[in-house]
Amino acid sequence: QFWVSFCDDAGSIENEAAARGLIAKAFSVIESFMYDNHLKLNPGKTQFIPFSRKKVTSSYAPLVLNNQVTIFPSCEVRNLGVIMDSNLSFVSHVNQLRRSCFYQLRRLRSIRVFVPSSQLETLIHAFITSRLDFCCSIYHPLPKNLVPRVQTIQNACAKFVTGAKKFDSATAARFKLHWLPVAARSKFRILTYAYRIVHTKEAIPKYLSEPYSTVKHGRVTRNNLSNSLHCSYKFRLVTVGCRSVYCSILYLWNSLPSDLRYIPTYTAFKRSLKTYLFRQAYELF
């Protein structure tokens, strides 16, 4: 499955027509590539989704490709396991994640009496935590009402491992297991990207590393001493642009203490970062 998208900030008819032409051109290139490699593109499984703000109510016309195939707009598409809607609210993705995780948790509860207590955490990591950590960087810019819904999954898992009762504190169970909350795990993932952008750009994709540069001035300033980042992209819309991973990397990295930014090795940085986020999440400062 090939997923092609475009970003139209201006919203004018001319820009939309140009973007449609680019998508049709990209589709023909992909189709030619597959034909040369003895593959056939299935138009019935090809999806087209326009992304827009909630206030934009204009309907989008179907996309007509070069081979006269008509693709109608979809409200939701699945891309690499993540369900994306036209407003990028990720409500459907969170609902699907909760259903799959709680289904796995119910299955594990049925065999808990046969599993040693020392192996319960391993089972949780294999069947549920791996789902929570997959593409977890999208949880950081989620609306505030959705993050607690994801957090309830981890809370139930923590009580399952520790044997806590229904009305016991989930925070105490997570603290006992030394688990970072969902929001902190998302920050951890994004900050590991930021560290590789600053220190080892060859280990990060170019589309993530190219917009960034370290702040340098002609004289000694606090920014020079703090190893802060600067992004060439301009974020015009707070509710949309500032939810992007580019803005999240910039904000979270520049908010870190300067001693964490200068840690020389990636392994030591991850260890120190987890300790910092753990103390911050459970207010241990």
Predicted features and spans:
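Hydrophobic/basic alpha-helical segments
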Residues: Q1-F285
